[in-house]
């Protein structure tokens, strides 16, 4: 067998394999003889069909079968000998499968990039630290009180903090726009859930006294046809309600399943939950910072085949988020625009390549104790921790998910161990509620 390897553009390789005709003909003849012993053809007894008849009738199909199988066996051997690791399925084209000639074919594919990990030992990586303070707990208590206000109807003009039920319709240039109207819409004035100016415009309004307000949609509003535009909203207030904060007493604590200890037990429970969520978020943010820093100093050529595969995974994930998991295995996924997923796919592929190389270089293996500890940590947040443990341990797939998370933590820990680090203190709210240009409702 002769093998030649040609480097094409980037990671693409072209392998040409030539198998001697003697080997091909020997295999073809062997299969035809075996076929002659069992084939049934009209006019001949089973096993008595002349070889030349079998050959004339089945030679082409047997030759194609031999060619397919030889591609599988010889290509694997060629890749092994030349230390080539395909990043995707090779595109194979047979060049010659004629009798009496060597069997030749080409295989074109991308190879996995070969590189050495550059460690983070130069520029410092900034990580964050945070903790739950008494003030954070008090703020959370106040949020819970706000969420549990007792509302009663009033007749006075709307003031900040009131809840209103309104009918409204929005107009652009005196024409109604899609999604700009609602009936019986509940809104707490001052909640900031609507576009700037909308809630302020309702202050002072009275029941069943229609009025108009003019507001402008933010320049970065999610709907491009509305962004930056001035709109008029015709509003009718149907109901005004004033809220009363519940007292901080045992009755309030019992609403959150606190049976003993009253408000102090509630605060303790809230602090523990906040600390657990804060730790999870800080770990996630620091892990992302470490991984991003590792990617920034390790520039790797990414195989298009891996990016394409990851894009398909992301499309599938989006389909599940939009339409649920109940669908047939062969159901066609909508052709979402590729650009929606390309950057995320490239990041995942880049990080995956670095991750695999880092694990190999530092011989990192998922530690069973750490896997069990992570399961215990997950279980501690549930009312029936033993059931959650049993759920993870009942499936190799479930355990593999935890092992992957443990590996991520172990890799992040190792990167941090070798890197130059500096820390930035952040308060609870800045970590848990980072400011985003989120779209607010204006309909």
From Swiss-Prot:
Keyword Cytoplasm appears in the UniProt entry: yes
Keywords from the UniProt entry: Cell cycle, Cell division, Chaperone, Cytoplasm, Isomerase, Rotamase
GO cellular component terms, alphabetically, are: cytoplasm
GO BP terms: 'de novo' cotranslational protein folding; cell division; chaperone-mediated protein folding; protein transport; protein unfolding
The record's disulfide annotation reads none
Q: What is its main location?
A: cytoplasm
- Residue ranges occupied by any PPIase FKBP-type domain in the UniProt entry: 161-246
Keyword Cell division listed? The answer is yes
List the subcellular locations: Cytoplasm
Kindly give the SUPFAM superfamilies that the UniProt entry links to this protein.
FKBP-like, Triger factor/SurA peptide-binding domain-like, Trigger factor ribosome-binding domain
An example Gene Ontology molecular-function term: ribosome binding
Into which EC class is this enzyme placed? Answer: isomerase
Organism's domain of life? Bacteria
InterPro entries in the record, alphabetically? PPIase_dom_sf, PPIase_FKBP_dom, Trig_fac, Trigger_fac_C, Trigger_fac_C_sf, Trigger_fac_ribosome-bd_bac, Trigger_fac_ribosome-bd_sf, Trigger_fact/SurA_dom_sf
Q: Which reaction does it catalyse?
A: [protein]-peptidylproline (omega=180) = [protein]-peptidylproline (omega=0)
Q: Which residues form a coiled coil?
A: none
Q: EC no.?
A: 5.2.1.8
Tell what the record comments on domains. Consists of 3 domains; the N-terminus binds the ribosome, the middle domain has PPIase activity, while the C-terminus has intrinsic chaperone activity on its own.
Q: Which NCBIfam families match?
A: tig
The similarity comment for this entry is: Belongs to the FKBP-type PPIase family. Tig subfamily.
HAMAP family, A to Z: Trigger_factor_Tig (MF_00303)
Query: What does the protein in this record do?
Result: Involved in protein export. Acts as a chaperone by maintaining the newly synthesized protein in an open conformation. Functions as a peptidyl-prolyl cis-trans isomerase.
The protein here is known as Trigger factor
- Which gene is this protein's source? tig
